[in-house]
Protein backbone atom coordinates (compact mmCIF):
# COMPACT_ATOMS: atom_id res chain seq x y z
CA UNK A 1 0.00 0.00 0.00
CA UNK A 2 1.32 3.45 -0.84
CA UNK A 3 2.08 5.55 2.24
CA UNK A 4 0.69 9.07 2.00
CA UNK A 5 1.92 12.11 3.90
CA UNK A 6 -1.14 11.70 6.13
CA UNK A 7 -0.09 8.15 7.05
CA UNK A 8 3.49 9.26 7.68
CA UNK A 9 2.33 12.08 9.95
CA UNK A 10 0.03 9.78 11.89
CA UNK A 11 2.64 7.05 12.35
CA UNK A 12 5.38 9.45 13.33
CA UNK A 13 3.05 11.20 15.74
CA UNK A 14 2.47 7.92 17.60
CA UNK A 15 6.21 7.32 17.86
CA UNK A 16 6.86 10.80 19.23
CA UNK A 17 3.87 10.99 21.53
CA UNK A 18 5.93 9.93 24.52
CA UNK A 19 8.50 12.64 23.85
CA UNK A 20 6.03 15.45 23.39
CA UNK A 21 3.45 14.51 25.98
CA UNK A 22 5.52 13.02 28.80
CA UNK A 23 4.70 14.97 31.92
CA UNK A 24 2.58 17.58 30.18
CA UNK A 25 -0.27 17.48 27.68
CA UNK A 26 -0.08 21.09 26.59
CA UNK A 27 2.50 23.81 26.00
CA UNK A 28 3.54 25.99 28.88
CA UNK A 29 1.18 28.60 30.32
CA UNK A 30 4.08 30.13 32.28
CA UNK A 31 5.20 33.40 30.68
CA UNK A 32 8.77 32.69 31.78
CA UNK A 33 8.86 29.28 30.08
CA UNK A 34 8.49 28.40 26.41
CA UNK A 35 8.57 25.10 24.53
CA UNK A 36 9.94 25.43 20.99
CA UNK A 37 10.18 22.82 18.21
CA UNK A 38 13.39 22.68 16.18
CA UNK A 39 15.04 20.36 13.66
CA UNK A 40 17.81 18.19 15.13
CA UNK A 41 21.34 19.13 14.17
CA UNK A 42 22.65 22.55 13.18
CA UNK A 43 19.35 24.40 13.60
CA UNK A 44 19.07 23.07 17.14
CA UNK A 45 22.65 24.22 17.79
CA UNK A 46 21.62 27.75 16.74
CA UNK A 47 18.49 27.57 18.89
CA UNK A 48 20.64 26.58 21.87
CA UNK A 49 22.40 29.94 21.56
CA UNK A 50 19.02 31.71 21.47
CA UNK A 51 18.04 29.70 24.56
CA UNK A 52 21.09 31.00 26.41
CA UNK A 53 20.41 34.59 25.33
CA UNK A 54 16.77 34.29 26.43
CA UNK A 55 17.79 33.15 29.89
CA UNK A 56 20.45 35.81 30.33
CA UNK A 57 18.46 38.77 28.96
CA UNK A 58 14.88 37.94 29.92
CA UNK A 59 15.02 35.20 32.55
CA UNK A 60 13.10 33.03 30.05
CA UNK A 61 13.47 29.26 30.32
CA UNK A 62 13.47 27.75 26.83
CA UNK A 63 12.71 24.04 26.35
CA UNK A 64 13.81 22.85 22.91
CA UNK A 65 12.06 19.81 21.39
CA UNK A 66 14.03 18.21 18.54
CA UNK A 67 12.50 16.66 15.42
CA UNK A 68 14.22 14.61 12.72
CA UNK A 69 12.20 16.13 9.87
CA UNK A 70 9.54 18.65 8.88
CA UNK A 71 6.39 16.52 9.15
CA UNK A 72 5.53 17.02 12.82
CA UNK A 73 6.52 20.41 14.30
CA UNK A 74 3.50 22.23 12.89
CA UNK A 75 1.16 19.48 14.12
CA UNK A 76 2.60 19.78 17.61
CA UNK A 77 2.42 23.58 17.62
CA UNK A 78 -1.14 23.69 16.30
CA UNK A 79 -2.24 21.10 18.90
CA UNK A 80 -0.75 23.11 21.75
CA UNK A 81 2.03 20.63 22.55
CA UNK A 82 4.53 23.35 21.61
CA UNK A 83 4.36 27.11 22.07
CA UNK A 84 6.24 27.80 18.85
CA UNK A 85 8.58 26.30 16.28
CA UNK A 86 11.50 27.56 14.23
CA UNK A 87 12.35 25.47 11.16
CA UNK A 88 10.40 26.60 8.07
CA UNK A 89 10.01 29.40 5.55
CA UNK A 90 6.78 31.27 4.87
CA UNK A 91 5.70 29.35 1.72
CA UNK A 92 6.03 26.05 3.64
CA UNK A 93 3.86 27.42 6.46
CA UNK A 94 1.24 28.72 4.06
CA UNK A 95 1.04 25.35 2.31
CA UNK A 96 0.79 23.43 5.60
CA UNK A 97 -1.93 25.78 6.90
CA UNK A 98 -3.91 25.29 3.70
CA UNK A 99 -3.46 21.52 3.59
CA UNK A 100 -4.12 20.74 7.25
CA UNK A 101 -6.28 23.62 8.43
CA UNK A 102 -3.73 24.87 10.95
CA UNK A 103 -4.12 28.27 12.61
CA UNK A 104 -0.41 29.08 12.64
CA UNK A 105 1.21 32.44 11.96
CA UNK A 106 4.69 33.85 11.40
CA UNK A 107 5.77 36.10 14.27
CA UNK A 108 9.18 37.09 12.89
CA UNK A 109 12.03 36.28 10.53
CA UNK A 110 15.12 34.23 11.37
CA UNK A 111 17.57 33.30 8.59
CA UNK A 112 17.70 32.71 4.86
CA UNK A 113 19.29 29.28 4.33
CA UNK A 114 20.12 29.15 0.61
CA UNK A 115 19.12 26.01 -1.26
CA UNK A 116 21.82 24.72 -3.59
CA UNK A 117 22.74 21.92 -5.97
CA UNK A 118 25.48 19.55 -4.79
CA UNK A 119 27.37 16.74 -6.46
CA UNK A 120 30.32 14.45 -5.87
CA UNK A 121 30.57 13.79 -9.61
CA UNK A 122 30.66 17.23 -11.22
CA UNK A 123 31.85 20.75 -10.41
CA UNK A 124 29.93 23.00 -12.82
CA UNK A 125 26.48 23.27 -14.40
CA UNK A 126 28.08 22.76 -17.81
CA UNK A 127 29.12 19.24 -16.73
CA UNK A 128 25.53 18.11 -16.14
CA UNK A 129 25.04 15.49 -18.85
CA UNK A 130 22.09 14.52 -21.03
CA UNK A 131 19.69 12.37 -19.01
CA UNK A 132 21.33 13.18 -15.66
CA UNK A 133 19.34 12.38 -12.51
CA UNK A 134 18.61 15.33 -10.24
CA UNK A 135 17.22 14.61 -6.77
CA UNK A 136 14.99 17.29 -5.23
CA UNK A 137 12.78 17.63 -2.10
CA UNK A 138 9.29 16.16 -2.36
CA UNK A 139 7.31 18.54 -0.13
CA UNK A 140 5.37 21.03 -2.29
CA UNK A 141 7.12 24.25 -1.30
CA UNK A 142 10.70 22.98 -1.43
CA UNK A 143 9.97 20.98 -4.58
CA UNK A 144 8.82 24.21 -6.20
CA UNK A 145 11.83 26.01 -4.81
CA UNK A 146 14.19 23.42 -6.32
CA UNK A 147 12.49 23.60 -9.72
CA UNK A 148 12.78 27.39 -9.70
CA UNK A 149 16.48 27.01 -8.96
CA UNK A 150 16.87 24.64 -11.92
CA UNK A 151 15.08 27.20 -14.08
CA UNK A 152 17.39 29.95 -12.80
CA UNK A 153 20.31 27.84 -14.05
CA UNK A 154 18.55 27.48 -17.45
CA UNK A 155 18.34 23.69 -17.06
CA UNK A 156 14.55 23.64 -17.39
CA UNK A 157 11.71 26.02 -18.26
CA UNK A 158 8.52 26.16 -16.19
CA UNK A 159 4.99 27.11 -17.16
CA UNK A 160 4.32 30.78 -16.47
CA UNK A 161 2.03 31.85 -13.65
CA UNK A 162 2.87 29.06 -11.19
CA UNK A 163 4.46 31.37 -8.64
CA UNK A 164 6.42 29.60 -5.90
CA UNK A 165 4.65 26.25 -6.21
CA UNK A 166 5.41 24.69 -9.61
CA UNK A 167 5.54 20.90 -9.90
CA UNK A 168 7.37 18.61 -12.29
CA UNK A 169 4.21 18.61 -14.44
CA UNK A 170 4.83 22.31 -15.09
CA UNK A 171 8.15 21.71 -16.86
CA UNK A 172 7.63 22.88 -20.44
CA UNK A 173 11.21 22.51 -21.66
CA UNK A 174 13.90 20.11 -20.46
CA UNK A 175 16.69 20.36 -23.06
CA UNK A 176 19.05 17.96 -21.28
CA UNK A 177 16.24 15.50 -20.51
CA UNK A 178 16.99 15.56 -16.81
CA UNK A 179 15.42 12.82 -14.71
CA UNK A 180 13.78 14.40 -11.66
CA UNK A 181 13.81 12.23 -8.51
CA UNK A 182 11.63 13.47 -5.62
CA UNK A 183 12.70 12.48 -2.09
CA UNK A 184 12.05 13.55 1.51
CA UNK A 185 14.44 16.38 2.36
CA UNK A 186 16.30 14.50 5.09
CA UNK A 187 17.21 11.72 2.62
CA UNK A 188 18.88 14.00 0.08
CA UNK A 189 22.38 14.22 1.62
CA UNK A 190 22.65 10.42 1.49
CA UNK A 191 21.99 10.22 -2.25
CA UNK A 192 25.13 12.21 -2.97
CA UNK A 193 26.87 8.82 -2.68
CA UNK A 194 24.33 7.08 -4.94
CA UNK A 195 25.98 6.28 -8.30
CA UNK A 196 22.62 6.80 -10.03
CA UNK A 197 22.24 10.40 -8.81
CA UNK A 198 24.24 13.16 -10.48
CA UNK A 199 23.03 16.21 -8.54
CA UNK A 200 20.97 16.69 -5.38
CA UNK A 201 19.29 19.99 -4.54
CA UNK A 202 19.45 20.31 -0.76
CA UNK A 203 18.53 22.96 1.79
CA UNK A 204 21.18 24.30 4.16
CA UNK A 205 19.37 22.62 7.05
CA UNK A 206 20.15 19.16 5.71
CA UNK A 207 23.48 19.75 3.95
CA UNK A 208 25.12 20.82 7.22
CA UNK A 209 25.37 17.19 8.38
CA UNK A 210 27.72 16.44 5.46
CA UNK A 211 30.21 19.17 6.35
CA UNK A 212 29.71 20.79 2.94
CA UNK A 213 29.41 24.57 2.62
CA UNK A 214 26.59 26.08 0.52
CA UNK A 215 28.87 28.91 -0.52
CA UNK A 216 32.06 26.94 -1.19
CA UNK A 217 30.96 23.43 -2.19
CA UNK A 218 27.79 23.80 -4.25
CA UNK A 219 27.54 23.45 -8.03
CA UNK A 220 24.89 26.21 -8.07
CA UNK A 221 23.07 28.18 -5.37
CA UNK A 222 20.10 30.47 -4.77
CA UNK A 223 20.51 34.21 -4.72
CA UNK A 224 20.68 35.75 -1.25
CA UNK A 225 17.49 37.75 -1.94
CA UNK A 226 15.49 34.52 -1.90
CA UNK A 227 11.84 34.86 -0.73
CA UNK A 228 12.35 31.76 1.41
CA UNK A 229 13.40 33.42 4.67
CA UNK A 230 12.82 31.16 7.68
CA UNK A 231 10.43 32.24 10.41
CA UNK A 232 9.44 31.75 14.04
CA UNK A 233 5.91 30.32 14.08
CA UNK A 234 3.24 30.35 16.79
CA UNK A 235 -0.54 29.95 16.96
CA UNK A 236 -3.04 32.74 16.41
CA UNK A 237 -3.97 32.53 20.10
CA UNK A 238 -0.44 32.99 21.47
CA UNK A 239 1.35 35.02 18.80
CA UNK A 240 1.45 38.08 21.09
CA UNK A 241 2.43 36.19 24.24
CA UNK A 242 5.35 37.69 26.13
CA UNK A 243 7.36 34.44 26.06
CA UNK A 244 7.02 34.24 22.26
CA UNK A 245 8.11 37.87 21.85
CA UNK A 246 11.11 37.38 24.13
CA UNK A 247 12.23 34.24 22.34
CA UNK A 248 12.00 36.04 18.98
CA UNK A 249 14.08 38.93 20.33
CA UNK A 250 16.62 36.43 21.64
CA UNK A 251 16.80 34.67 18.28
CA UNK A 252 17.21 37.97 16.42
CA UNK A 253 20.33 38.82 18.41
CA UNK A 254 23.96 39.44 17.40
CA UNK A 255 24.99 36.39 19.42
CA UNK A 256 22.73 34.10 17.40
CA UNK A 257 23.72 35.68 14.07
CA UNK A 258 27.40 35.14 14.86
CA UNK A 259 26.83 31.53 15.95
CA UNK A 260 24.79 30.72 12.83
CA UNK A 261 27.50 32.10 10.56
CA UNK A 262 29.98 29.68 12.13
CA UNK A 263 27.66 26.67 12.42
CA UNK A 264 26.43 26.92 8.82
CA UNK A 265 29.81 27.76 7.27
CA UNK A 266 28.54 31.11 6.01
CA UNK A 267 25.31 29.55 4.72
CA UNK A 268 22.96 31.43 7.07
CA UNK A 269 22.00 35.01 6.20
CA UNK A 270 20.14 37.02 8.90
CA UNK A 271 16.66 37.84 7.64
CA UNK A 272 15.74 40.55 10.15
UniProtKB/Swiss-Prot annotation:
Q: Where is the lipid attached (N-palmitoyl cysteine)?
A: 24
Q: Where in the cell is it found?
A: Cell inner membrane
Keyword Endoplasmic reticulum listed? The answer is no
Q: What's in the keyword line of the UniProt record?
A: Cell inner membrane, Cell membrane, Lipoprotein, Membrane, Palmitate, Signal
Q: Which SUPFAM superfamilies match?
A: Periplasmic binding protein-like II
CC terms in the record's Gene Ontology section: plasma membrane
Positions of S-diacylglycerol cysteine lipidation: 24
Position of the signal peptide: 1-23
> Record keywords: Cell inner membrane included?
yes
Per UniProt, what is the membrane topology? Answer: Lipid-anchor
UniProt family annotation? Belongs to the NlpA lipoprotein family.
- This protein is called Lipoprotein 28
* Species: Escherichia coli O157:H7
Amino acid sequence: MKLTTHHLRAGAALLLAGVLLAGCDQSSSDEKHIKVGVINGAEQDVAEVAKKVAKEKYGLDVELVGFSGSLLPNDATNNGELDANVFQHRPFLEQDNQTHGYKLVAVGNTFVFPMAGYSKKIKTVAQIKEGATVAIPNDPTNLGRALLLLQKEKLITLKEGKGLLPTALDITDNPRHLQIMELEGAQLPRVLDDPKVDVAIISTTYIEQTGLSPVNDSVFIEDKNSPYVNILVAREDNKNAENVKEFLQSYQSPEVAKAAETIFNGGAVPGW
